[in-house]
Amino acid sequence: MALKYVSSYLLAVAAGNENPSVDDLKKILDAVGSDVDEECLQGLVDSMSGKTVHETIAAGMTKLQSMPAGGAAMPAAAAGGAPAAAEDKAEAKKPEAEPEEEEDDMGFSLFD
């Protein structure tokens, strides 16, 4: 289902129509010049019948909160010395001296 159909449904509800019909949604989509798939609109209207938008959003938020976020936990590495050695090498490198401002001029002058 395309987001434009859900958006048109939410727009109709925000305008005060608590139970928009397929024709109401088609009018909204036609006003912006969008193509309309009537089967998709009918499926949306059927799935939202008897429910309010606020109840549907609250149910979705509850489902999202119950999902784990961040993926699975990684197992601890067996050899813990490898990352420390990499950090030592990074610290051993000295940052190169940044070029002077005059060297970066490349012949361009702001006031020429």
Curated annotation (Swiss-Prot):
Secretion signal, residue range per the UniProt entry: none
Disulfide bonds: none
Modification note: Phosphorylated.
InterPro entries to which the protein is assigned, alphabetical: P1/P2_N_sf (IPR038716), Ribosomal_P1/P2 (IPR027534), Ribosomal_P2 (IPR044076)
Biased composition (Low complexity): 69-85
Keywords, sorted A to Z: Phosphoprotein, Ribonucleoprotein, Ribosomal protein
Biased composition (Basic and acidic residues): 86-97
Chain positions covered by the region annotation Disordered: 69-112
Gene Ontology molecular function: structural constituent of ribosome
GO terms of biological process kind: cytoplasmic translational elongation
A Gene Ontology cellular-component term: cytosolic large ribosomal subunit
Keyword Ribonucleoprotein annotated: yes
Similarity annotation: Belongs to the eukaryotic ribosomal protein P1/P2 family.
Function: Plays an important role in the elongation step of protein synthesis.
Quaternary structure (record): P1 and P2 exist as dimers at the large ribosomal subunit.
Protein name: Large ribosomal subunit protein P2
Record organism: Babesia bovis
